[in-house]
Amino acid sequence: MKRTPHLLAIQSHVVFGHAGNSAAVFPMQRIGVNAWPLNTVQFSNHTQYGQWAGEVLAPAQIPALVEGISNIGELGHCDAVLSGYLGSAEQGRAILAGVERIKAVNPKALYLCDPVMGHPEKGCIVPPEVSEFLLDEAAATADILCPNQLELDSFCGRRAQSLEDCVNMARSLLQRGPQVVLVKHLAYPGRAEEHFEMLLVTAEHSWHLRRPLLAFPRQPVGVGDLTSGLFLARVLLGDSWVQAFEFTAAAVHEVLLETQACASYELQLVRAQDRIAHPRVRFEAQLLAL
């Protein structure tokens, strides 16, 4: 029997709706990966509603929980760590210590950092200390880095002006340590407005992918969290980088189609679960000569 991969997902959680682990854990489990959620914040709902209740996890709890998993002999079974939204830079450093601990017992374990800072259309949503931590410390530790356009621009200290510029900027991030950079959402000047564009860059190659941009009265939250989670899960299941890239684009599009059909502000993950596992659409990533 083929072994089920395990990953530790360290990011935000909402009680109602889907963001952070609430957007990523179920889809990862649905496609065959055992996700262990460790929630950096627990809020009633995502913050785009304008009001919420809840609290940030004390940073000391992260190593304590990792230690608890170690004490029952399970830490060595962890194949990857995923980190997303951080409530503080101190939380981030606790996560990196956890990554180091896991890699000490499983050197093959991967670390995917989703450097959540904000959205190209909404601006930065995290304190400066978190941005600085992501730029200066997290990127150097990550095996897989998954910024959006705002975050790519922040890492490189300037705004991208073209697709080629985005490729060069992503490639420059590889020099900090990651094996691969997945840009979840491109928003460079002159792009086709009717498409949603993504980029995958390794040291040897770069791939560009387009899917139709679906219209919503209010854009659903959690799409980036879903994207990062599915990409990492597919890699753990044995996909190549580009196979995971194409699967992720298709599965996320299926969720958005279901969400649009339901006229919902929240991602319709439960209704779309079979479409996540077996996407009916397919998008082919184009190898770029750049």
Swiss-Prot record:
It catalyses: pyridoxal + ATP = pyridoxal 5'-phosphate + ADP + H(+). GO terms for molecular function: ATP binding; magnesium ion binding; pyridoxal kinase activity. Gene3D superfamilies: 3.40.1190.20. GO terms for biological process: pyridoxal 5'-phosphate salvage. The keyword Lipid metabolism does not apply. Pathway: Cofactor metabolism; pyridoxal 5'-phosphate salvage; pyridoxal 5'-phosphate from pyridoxal: step 1/1. GO terms for cellular component: cytosol. It comes from the Bacteria. Substrate binds at S12, T47, Q48, D225. Its cofactor is Mg(2+). Keywords: ATP-binding, Kinase, Magnesium, Nucleotide-binding, Transferase. ATP binds at D114, E151, K184, R211, P212, L213, L214. Pyridoxal kinase involved in the salvage pathway of pyridoxal 5'-phosphate (PLP). Catalyzes the phosphorylation of pyridoxal to PLP. Homodimer. Belongs to the pyridoxine kinase family. PdxY subfamily. This is Pyridoxal kinase PdxY. It comes from Pseudomonas putida (strain ATCC 47054 / DSM 6125 / CFBP 8728 / NCIMB 11950 / KT2440). The gene is pdxY.
